[in-house]
């Protein structure tokens, strides 16, 4: 009996690795001789680096890089056990959480630190880089990132433009001859579940600018600046990014990654499950167990449980979802490959109590799920 355990984290409570450990502990009480394969998963957002490190027997690295406001921040990233693949979260270097609420200003925040993390990955010898671009504080179109990698973004006087989305209107020319040559031999995949274009009513500035501190006037300025930026990119690089789905992700970072680095933007969960070789683990298993902090109707939109279930159903494997909580509309997940769902909560309490007791609750629920399966197996002969 081979059981694949592939959960996401329980946000603010347990990492994906800890959730997997708790599930395995509970199941082992009933099925001590089963083969357990633990594959912590993430959806390309928070926790992706940690999950990828755990699944590839990799290592966490740290680097001092330029933060969103130009200050130095100690950002973490990861490298796979074989040293070939680097894992980067934009939020670690250029994230909104790095900027106090009163200082959030997308006219000045820069993505330079993310470019510096990419340089760290190249220095390590990585030839594959997976980047999660959620949680950014920036609206600079990825300009800071490409400047860190050696591109020259110059104004009419030949001087490099400054930090932030507020400087893009001064851009006159782009020179990529100085881009780090190692990028040509590197495959960059971007975990991105946002399909917004770069500009317009559904663009980066209008949709995501407010959460980054943009006023209405700033949104208009930022959108105009990104439109100008796209025109200069089209003229210099012969790439039209203005209306490409995903170009508006992370304040236009999607556009820069595609135009300057030839990166591929794909669903976060799709990139992660492929990188983790999830199919290889699942194709000959008996049962798949997944989960996250809450399973509900939103889980069908790029979340880990459905991503795992999609892989499992290719091989007609049963899937059980274990969550901290379920909602009234959770039944929709049964149409997307999850056969049964269970909540680990046993009593009414505060959210803090649920967080504190999560590990033990998952163990208990997993043990009881396993016992129920064992009863069914015995009755089936």
Swiss-Prot record:
UniProt note: pH dependence: Optimum pH is 7.3-7.9.
Pfam families for the chain: Gly_kinase (PF02595)
Transmembrane segments: none
Domain of life: Bacteria
A biological process term (GO) from this entry: organic acid phosphorylation
SUPFAM superfamilies: Glycerate kinase I
EC code(s) of this entry: 2.7.1.165
Keywords noted in UniProt: ATP-binding, Kinase, Nucleotide-binding, Transferase
Induction: In glycerate, glucarate and glycolate-grown cells but not in glucose-grown cells (at protein level).
Gene3D superfamilies: Glycerate kinase, domain 1 (3.40.50.10350), Glycerate kinase, domain 2 (3.90.1510.10)
Record GO terms (molecular function): ATP binding; glycerate 2-kinase activity; glycerate kinase activity
Catalytic activity: (R)-glycerate + ATP = (2R)-2-phosphoglycerate + ADP + H(+)
Family: Belongs to the glycerate kinase type-1 family.
Further remark: GK1 has a half-life of 92 minutes while GK2 has a half-life of 11 minutes at 49 degrees Celsius.
Role according to the record: Catalyzes the transfer of the phosphate group from adenosine triphosphate (ATP) to (R)-glycerate to form (2R)-2-phosphoglycerate, an enzymatic step in (L)-glucarate/galactarate catabolic pathway.
NCBIfam families: glycerate kinase (TIGR00045), PRK10342.1 (NF007668)
Protein name according to UniProt: Glycerate 2-kinase
Organism this protein belongs to: Escherichia coli (strain K12)
Name of the encoding gene: garK
